[in-house]
């Protein structure tokens, strides 16, 4: 690029008017994971660039293999990272909706009117929309994780549900085995988005079969409760949770822990295998 053109482009970029545009867009459309949630991705990026691994350099230098470099790097740093951010965004929206609904309802003395009765309130569509988006993004994040992991083996595979079985077929075992162990650890935590046999997951129910609600608002002397819905909320919920946010918080913690452990293990196993092969 001509030096004068580069200088003009740089000057334009740092012009207050352009910076103002960037700031405006960021404030409206931008989203960023927390510093803690970015750590596994920074760990992967550091491995990828400081210094660049020999096998990555070989991929980039070979036109027939270069596509695997892009899949390897973008699979973690773009596909997985951005989709984890998507899940986190929908989770935060769901928590905000719950908080706003409860705060608004508690401004009214409904307990005095209801006595010993319970009343159900309708039209929670916005809540439903965000819940469905959360579930779909959650499953997508897991499948992107599976796909990212398989790129090192130069394989296109995208099912987190079947990842453990698939990894058993791949070499080197020193990389695949610890990932299989982690998959076995976390898979039971994700049954709500992973179908098995005749059991349909929430993700499949939403995608293929029918409308799934976040729940139905119930008001009584006990106060506000979101009942039923995809998480089958109620006082008898298996986890003991009585609020949607409690259940979703557990889902988020499990997903973040899975991504963190698997990315760290992925990098460490690859690094060790590359050292051994020298």
Question: Could you describe each region identified by the protein language model?
Answer:
Residues 1-96, 110-135, 146-278:
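Acidic, Ser/Thr/Gly/Pro-rich intrinsically disordered interaction regions
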Residues 101-104, 108-113:
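Mixed-charge, low-complexity intrinsically disordered segments
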């Amino acid at each position: 690029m001509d030096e004068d053109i580069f200088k003009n482009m740089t000057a334009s970029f740092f012009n207050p008017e352009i910076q103002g545009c960037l700031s405006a867009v960021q404030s409206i459309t931008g989203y960023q994971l927390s510093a803690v949630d970015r750590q596994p991705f920074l760990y992967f990026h550091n491995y990828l660039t400081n210094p660049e691994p020999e096998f990555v350099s070989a991929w980039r230098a070979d036109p027939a293999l270069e596509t695997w470099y892009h899949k390897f790097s973008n699979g973690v740093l773009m596909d997985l990272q951005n989709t984890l951010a998507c899940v986190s965004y929908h989770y935060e929206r769901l928590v905000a909706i719950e908080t706003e609904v409860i705060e608004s309802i508690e401004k009214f003395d409904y307990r005095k009117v209801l006595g010993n009765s319970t009343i159900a309130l309708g039209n929670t569509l916005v809540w439903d929309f965000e819940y469905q988006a959360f579930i779909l993004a959650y499953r997508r994040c897991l499948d992107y994780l599976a796909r990212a992991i398989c790129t090192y083996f130069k394989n296109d595979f995208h099912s987190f549900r079947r990842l453990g079985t698939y990894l058993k077929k791949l070499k080197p075992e020193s990389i695949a085995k610890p990932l299989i162990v982690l998959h076995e650890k976390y898979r039971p935590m994700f049954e709500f988005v992973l179908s098995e046999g005749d059991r349909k997951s929430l993700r499949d129910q939403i995608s293929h079969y029918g409308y799934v609600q976040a729940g139905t608002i119930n008001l009584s002397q006990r106060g506000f409760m979101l009942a039923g819905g995809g998480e089958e909320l109620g006082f008898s919920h298996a986890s003991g949770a009585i609020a949607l946010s409690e259940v979703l918080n557990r889902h988020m913690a499990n997903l973040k822990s899975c991504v963190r452990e698997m990315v760290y293990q992925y990098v460490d196993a690859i690094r060790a295998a590359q050292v051994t092969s020298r």
